């Protein structure tokens, strides 16, 4: 049996069962609340309890998504009654983003596995190890990680590693995106992402769906993924139809099995032969869903531009033909693949926008010339590409396969019957076994019972979900048992087998929240500066009232002037939000010359660096190192981190991205730049590239300026001039 789990999305109950039937070993699914896909057709708690019985009898698993940020009220009042019945029904794990939720679940449901969500932005094995003591047994690295980084994680930890191998890619690091909340007041961290990144934007360098990524497909890379030591291959797509998750589950299960059973040489032969079943299956999976074709994701793509497709959003389909002739009301095109009744085609303009949609009336073979009527006024021209966005025959085939799969549970049976002793019947399935006992076996008065008679009665499963594939019996000679007793024993054994599929775990009352001491930054307001001009302005403030946050990546090249300006004034160090192990060594000399008064914890890597190098000064959580509830703040305190102080002035960072806008638009020159992008509804953002670490930060166009004088505030300056900065400082009585 394979050690690699195929983990499928289940956006509905139908999708859950379909994925299991087509080869998924586990599914991840939300329920009524707290999942990252609030608008999926999530099953109810009762439906999930039934699904858990089905899953466990088929040796499958169900993971519940609780991967959003919760308020104190939700955490203390609503989460326990949601999870408790599923825990008792044997829920296999919860996928979690909020560290407060992590702490709560580990305390109240200690026997349940917890998986750290990709929303936690974990970039290494030692970062994941931070949460082992909170019950984490598995983590999902950020989708921006490369296969080399995944291999390194495997060497760093024995925690299970779950990696996205197929489906949509977010432009922003998961969990770090605030764009949906900013544009439409629908927070991705609350499960309501509206995907505004898929909308068209304009910029001075180019227009289009500037932040829209292709979908990922890694079928050809299965050998590298398996050899990297990944435990679970995760397919994205809880908002997609059941046919999507079911079909992709079958493909990834099949090709993992091919590699594991037949080896690398056989698999590479499939990859090299473009007419192999592997490539045909990849083309079919494009028919199911793709955006701009497929890419290999950040796991394998070396050029980030290959990950983007700015010309079109939504299902791209597959190119099926080219227009040969266009006339008023008609289009003539040659097809290169088979077309089926009820396929949906799109005639597209050169910019990939839809010119006309056509539903196929008659089947056509590759090479056939098809004539179709089109609406007058539609832009149809010779050489125009025709795409299929719905493959009706493929969808029907998947549905038929789901319907006809025999998912009865195979059992092995063994009966032991000795005169004077209770008859024992043992049933063994994939995941568990049971033994039940009946009445004592009698000595025969007339005709003895035969093994064949007993086996015939045991094998009759009727309308149950079981089949008996193997049966053995030890029967003492000259014995007798009524067939009714055999039937009763079989019913009791099947009932016991089904009961055993439920965990048998029990949970008492919710444990009261014993509040712990929190760490709070109380020293002063904080000014985060980004330019030397701003640093010169910041030192005009009173160091008793104001501390300066110094982003090391922005000031390393000005080391001598920085030291001269600060003159032993204590500073707060901050590292890039996305930072790999060892990167801090780039700034070692600057760090050693500074009077480090505190460190900003804006990532797990920053926490690990602080634990190693800055044990004797306070650590302050950035607002993006989420701690929305009291329990999350307590977890930070256990790490030694002060909770963030409230934001004052500053542009909001709505995205931090591995993708680079300048690279997408062929403007990559290695120079830091600020690019204004505008959305269709007047939304404006600035994109700023960080070439040293090759990522972008996207900011709101304007800063927040409302003064709050009752407490210290954290002010973020980006590219303000000295005069603009002084004006803000005076408004806040800091100058």
Which residues fall in each region the model found?
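Active-site pocket-lining/capping segments in soluble small-molecule metabolic enzymes
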Residues: 1-122, 140-234, 239-735
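As written
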Residues: 135-136
